[in-house]
Amino acid sequence: MDLPALSRPRVVMGLLFFPRGGSAQVTRALAQALVEQGWQVTIVCSSLRLPSRLGDARTFFGDLDVRPVDCTAALQAADPLCADPPLPPSYEDRPGAPDRVLATVDNATYEHLVATWARVLREACADQADLLHLHHLTPLNAAAARVAPEVPVVGHLHGTELLLLETIEQGPPAHWVYAGAWAQRMRRWAAACQRLVVPSATQLTRAQALLGIDPARCVQLPNGFDPRRFERRSVDRMALWHRLLVERPLGWGPGREPGSVRYPPHVLGLFAQGPVLLYVGRFSAVKRLDLLISAYNRAREAFAVSAPLVLLGGFPGEWEGEHPLETIQRTGARDVFLAGWHDHDELPEIFAASDVVVLPSVREQFGLMLVEGMACGLPALAVKASGPGEIVTDGQTGWLVPPDDERALAAALVAVVNDAPERHRRGTAAAAAVHTHYSWPMLGARLACAYEALLGRPPVT
């Protein structure tokens, strides 16, 4: 029997950023799983209202109790971070982007961010919650300390905060004037959390070194997948790729709108001849898309059959370093396709129309798209480092190569394409492995147990 709302424990989840990347997917999935575990969940989150509906928190979180902070007007402000409400800053340094990197944000703007989110937390009655679950280390942590100092805080590291701290420790760029202040804040916020969720053993080790945290306060909880949606299925592959690349394209180039990169119908012949190699993710520097395109270009002549490489993702207008379209033009790579940013709900069908999920990232914090692709029966090709090195078993569920090794990556691509029986064998093993360890219902139950242990309460029944 369902418990009445008043008797169910309540957690307020906070996400400073508007929904676009992996941490938003994790927030939504955990919130849904916690509701199934008998918890009331309220989400506070930045939001954008754009024609594309990308970044819209209400659309993204669906039926969940979400309190969006509409930052749309801030995009037109002289300084978007000083608007009311402000656009959240970023962990990434993308020149010209409206959401500039945290380490360039001065103290006055920081105070404005904290005051804004303190107001948001008050309106969400955070001080009456049983727990606060704050994703990343951001001004939300400072706001929570002001509004709900007696409420236990569970922090959640997603990895981008660790990348920022590593850059600061190695010597930040000259324009990161406030890097030291932000590093101190992040360490202070981490120390104030009663528990810290980390998705992998690698991240736990890095978090200890960068934040000085006690591992006894950490909960290792990987990211997962929804077994009700991510599974093997049959799709009309040619129809799907026709829709994504020809009929309704969303690929884009620097300074251009989604749909500006489109392909003629005749290219679809490539998709009928051999395996489809799929990358899913953002166009950030750590993903090493330039390396992937170069390695693919090197490997292509050794393929026994045509094997198109599809780059699915790249939040519109956001990229670091060389844009993939520029890399394609520079290298002369053929058979590489930009499919644009697609809703998470479309991924199961896209995985079903593909044969291998590829992630060349050298500092991938976890590798959510690997798990989701593997759940759909795709073997993975990734780098033997960080999260992917823990998810993929080389020789069993996929292929692992050394970081930043173009030759090794090219050789692995050739092996993937030319050995169909091995590809199928590893894909079957991949699906079995992730279904055992990474389903969201199972992970949500583990998180609920961690909550209840922190509060000293028996499990919700």
How does the language model describe each region?
Residues H175-L196:
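Membrane-proximal helix-turn-helix segments that form the acceptor-binding/catalytic region
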Residues D394-G395, W399-E406, A415-A420:
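Conserved acidic donor-binding segment of nucleotide-sugar-dependent glycosyltransferases
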Residues L6, T42-D127:
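A conserved catalytic-core segment of Leloir-type glycosyltransferases
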Residues W341-H342, E349-S354:
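Short alpha-helical donor nucleotide-sugar binding micro-motif in glycosyltransferases
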Residues G313, G321-D345:
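Nucleotide-activated donor-binding/catalytic signature segment of Leloir-type glycosyltransferases, i.e.
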Residues T202, G224:
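Carbohydrate-associated surface elements
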Residues P379-A382:
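Short hydrophobic beta-strand element within catalytic cores of glycosyltransferases
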Residues V362:
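Aromatic "clamp/platform" in nucleotide-sugar-dependent glycosyltransferases that forms part
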